[in-house]
Amino acid sequence: MPYVDRQNRICGFLDIEENENSGKFLRRYFILDTREDSFVWYMDNPQNLPSGSSRVGAIKLTYISKVSDATKLRPKAEFCFVMNAGMRKYFLQANDQQDLVEWVNVLNKAIKITVPKQSDSQPASDSLSRQGDCGKKQVSYRTDIVGGVPIITPTQKEEVNECGESLDRNNLKRSQSHLPYFAPKPPSDSAVIKAGYCVKQGAVMKNWKRRYFQLDENTIGYFKSELEKEPLRVIPLKEVHKVQECKQSDIMMRDNLFEIVTTSRTFYVQADSPEEMHSWIKAVSGAIVAQRGPGRSSSSMRQARRLSNPCIQRSIPAGLQNPNSLSVLPGPQPPPHIPQPLAATLWSQAVPWRSEEFTNLLPRSSQGTSRSRLSLQESQLPK
């Protein structure tokens, strides 16, 4: 999806047919700059390229007459649109239908409000500048602010950019991965939830490199490319505390930056668009919840069972659980070791206990007690 960067330019990834009528679309990073009256594209986001990397191509907005849908002109190319620029038509391919509509709208709006300027030999100068840069050495640098003073130090050894060979190698990689966001990976034990390219900050040199990320049910790992089988690192989801949009993106001067906070380290990852950033945050957070959710629910169910079935209820006899059963308890039975006829005779001759015959044995008030003693003495006197 196209998005607006910090310099108020519209940026995003598209696939372009650089060689006319070749039918081969290569993935490039496009920048629409209305202030510079240009629509340029690079091999990748310039923030991720070595210092001094030149652009791959450029078109003046004044040269573009119309931008329209080209699905009928190129039926085999999905989500394709065309730019009419002078004597040539540039065919580009978006990620989806919404991406196509947004790019067509922003480009048509840009060419309408552009004021024509005097033409210059921009394409020729671009080709000359690219030829002049072929033999130069490209070095990536790291900028640190120490005491308010910027200090620039090289991050790696100088590499000679052998123009034709290096570009062909990059083009070969891009053509092999037509849509790197959805490039398939070899099947693994866990189902892949989300996969795609992002830019990650290194742990030691703090440099930014493009890596292929893959999220499954238990881990999130990153590879050097989508063709690699072994990941560079695997982060277990149980070690991830939170995933959120980075609050230091202004300090790092990075768009679409989010962070993965773990026990030992915070990983800073840059997506290609705001939509892709939010998609990654949502996917990783959902995987964490899905992994930790069943544990909480099972423990809560066990606790609920313990509260609903206390141990004291299990020791109560079944007959006493019903209060109505107390009124129908069986009467006294003879001992089992006595024969039945003899037991019946003994029980028939036994004096039955009646509660009213023992009421005189209960303690009474002092007056009642003294009166009963006098009555007893009076009864013993001779008459």
From Swiss-Prot:
Ranges of Low complexity composition bias in the record: 370-383
The protein's matches in CDD domains, at most eight in alphabetical order, are given as: PH1_TAPP1_2, PH2_TAPP1_2
Residues in the signal sequence: none
Q: Name one GO cellular component term.
A: cytosol
Q: Which GO terms fall under biological process for this protein?
A: androgen metabolic process; B cell receptor signaling pathway; cellular response to hydrogen peroxide; establishment of protein localization; estrogen metabolic process; face morphogenesis; female gonad development; Leydig cell differentiation
Entry-linked Pfam families: PH
* Chain spans, region Disordered: 362-383
Q: Does the keyword Calcium apply?
A: no
Q: Which InterPro entries match?
A: PH-like_dom_sf (IPR011993), PH_domain (IPR001849), PI-Interact_SigTrans_Reg (IPR051707)
Localization annotation: Cytoplasm; Cell membrane; Nucleus
Record's keyword terms, sorted: Cell membrane, Cytoplasm, Lipid-binding, Membrane, Nucleus, Phosphoprotein, Repeat
Taking every annotated instance into account, which residue ranges of this chain make up the domain PH? 7-112, 191-289
This protein's membrane topology, according to the annotation, is: Peripheral membrane protein
Q: What is known of its domains?
A: Binds to membranes enriched in PtdIns3,4P2 via the C-terminal PH domain.
Q: Which PANTHER family does this chain map to?
A: PLECKSTRIN HOMOLOGY DOMAIN-CONTAINING FAMILY A MEMBER 1, TANDEM PH DOMAIN CONTAINING PROTEIN
The UniProt function text for this chain reads: Binds specifically to phosphatidylinositol 3,4-diphosphate (PtdIns3,4P2), but not to other phosphoinositides. May recruit other proteins to the plasma membrane.
Please describe the quaternary structure of this protein.
Answer: Interacts with MPDZ and PTPN13.
Indicate what this protein is called per its UniProt record. Answer: Pleckstrin homology domain-containing family A member 1
Q: Which organism is it from?
A: Mus musculus (Mouse)
